[in-house]
From Swiss-Prot:
Residue positions the entry lists as glycosylated: 64, 102, 126, 192, 362
One GO BP: negative regulation of blood pressure
Protein name per UniProt: Retinoid-inducible serine carboxypeptidase
UniProt source species: Mus musculus
Record gene name: Scpep1
Keyword Protease: yes
PANTHER family linked: RETINOID-INDUCIBLE SERINE CARBOXYPEPTIDASE, SERINE PROTEASE FAMILY S10 SERINE CARBOXYPEPTIDASE
Length: 452
């Protein structure tokens, strides 16, 4: 057993060495990958709408990729790039400095990164009318892409396929999963759809907004007056949502965040133990000052495409991929993606999750302890609104502590699971769980995909 383990480790180091030697000697970022380990392409999902995907085949030294699951990663925003942020900042084989990531998911799954909705990352549209404006369009576009992908890559049709997501990507993942389940049942898409994981997901926006005040107050980041102000604007958001005024609710959501920033001395919405970074020059423009929506875009999209990542994607990566149109820059259309979805932001998707549970689809909810924008209190709140018949039995269970190492005594997370619903409480993590707690995120992925 020990000899087998050592052989696996040696093979892993050889794979890693060959991966790194693929870089040219003259430039640490101009590399050539081993044949067959990566593929990428565009799919025209609608007229004037072109979606980009990038696949990494699993590199486990002891198993063939066909023995491991395929994981599709969906970023948030909307407008955040999976091929960029998800890949180089969270779970891909390399970081933005092109150094190996110790907690990459690639040893345990093949990874499919998709820039979605259209206009995100390297995906692009030819006309402004082609941007997606709602969840239905997002899901429909993804069905076109997935059909094309599985038709062209039949080697993955029988491999367990999971969708993992983050933030607004979770809302999109839920809608996509419902349509994918239908397509698989109807035989229009051939794949072994095995489950969806919703990470710090914007499933019920109003439950998140309503929980911000109590959460911040409990963490000593609001006083009584601040709590009253935040609670007041949260009630306005609730009223707008109840009346179906979703665009108005989005504007009020933006105002709520401004009130929180003022009262907390600039708390970071993605990790409450850090401060927000200084905002850039464009924020002083008249457009910015009069538009809460532009401010939302600044906060929730631009942090997903920092300078280092943008330079990497628009430089060495674009050169490597070779198929990106010359006039397309990574992330250039992200703001338009975000603004086009204005009417969809505050719509709840609890009923979508209920459909998945009723269909028997495995649903995992996971959340970072230090996240504010989608805090755990809000997640727990919408879960309790599910109409799933087994919810009472789920609630009766006691959670189980998880550790990243069997020898460790430090609790890394808690989990509760019953039938096809699981909930993970990830400790010491903010909104981007794999970035903050890479080892625990990897362990969770292995648990969800039944590898532990």
């Amino acid at each position: 057993m020990e000899l087998s383990r050592r052989i696996c480790l040696v093979r892993l180091w050889l794979l890693l060495l060959s991966f790194l030697l693929g870089f040219s000697a003259g430039s640490a970022i101009d590399w050539r990958e081993p044949e067959g380990k990566e593929v990428w392409d565009y799919v025209t999902v609608r007229k004037d709408a072109h979606m980009f995907w990038w696949l990494y085949y699993a590199t486990n030294p002891c198993k063939n990729f066909s023995e491991l699951p395929l994981v599709m990663w969906l970023q948030g925003g909307p407008g955040g790039s999976s091929t960029g942020f998800g890949n180089f900042e969270e779970i891909g084989p390399l970081d933005t400095q092109l150094k190996p990531r110790n907690t990459t998911w690639l040893q345990w799954a093949s990874l499919l990164f998709v820039d979605n909705p259209v206009g995100t990352g390297f995906s692009y549209v030819n006309t402004t009318d082609a941007y997606a404006k709602d969840l239905d369009t997002v899901a429909s576009d993804m069905m076109v892409l997935l059909k094309s992908f599985f038709d062209c890559h039949k080697e993955f049709q029988t491999v367990p396929f999971y969708i993992f997501s983050e933030s607004y990507g979770g809302k999109m993942a839920a809608g996509i999963s419902v349509e994918l389940y239908k397509a698989v049942q109807q035989g229009t898409i051939k794949c072994n759809f095995s489950g969806v994981a919703l990470g710090d997901s914007w499933i019920s926006p109003v439950d998140s907004v309503l929980s911000w005040g109590p959460y911040l107050y409990s963490m000593s980041l609001l006083d009584n007056q601040g709590l009253a102000e935040v609670s007041d604007i949260a009630e306005q958001v609730l009223d707008a949502v109840n009346k179906g005024f979703y665009k108005e609710a989005t504007q009020l959501w933006g105002k709520a965040e401004m009130i929180i920033e003022k009262n907390t001395d600039g708390v970071n919405f993605y990790n409450i133990l850090t401060k927000s970074s200084p905002e850039k020059a464009m924020e002083s423009s008249l457009e910015f000052l009069r538009s809460p929506l532009v401010r939302l875009c600044q906060r929730h999209v631009r942090h997903l495409q920092g300078d280092a990542l943008s330079q990497l994607m628009n430089g060495p990566i674009k050169k490597k991929l070779k198929i990106i149109p010359e006039d397309i820059s990574w992330g250039a259309q992200a703001s338009y993606v975000f603004l086009s979805m204005e009417g969809d932001f505050m719509k709840p998707a609890i009923d979508v999750v209920d459909k998945l549970l009723a269909a028997g689809v495995n649903v995992t909810v996971y959340n970072g302890q230090l996240d504010l924008i989608v805090d755990t209190i809000g997640q727990e709140s919408w879960v309790q609104k599910l109409k799933w018949p087994q919810l009472s039995k789920f609630n009766q269970l006691k959670w189980k502590a998880l550790y990243t190492d069997p020898k460790s005594s430090e609790t890394a997370a808690f989990v509760k699971s019953y039938e096809n619903l699981a909930f993970y409480w990830i400790l010491k993590a903010g909104h981007m769980v794999p970035s903050d707690q890479g080892e625990m995120a990897l362990k969770m992925m292995k648990l969800v995909t039944k590898q532990e």
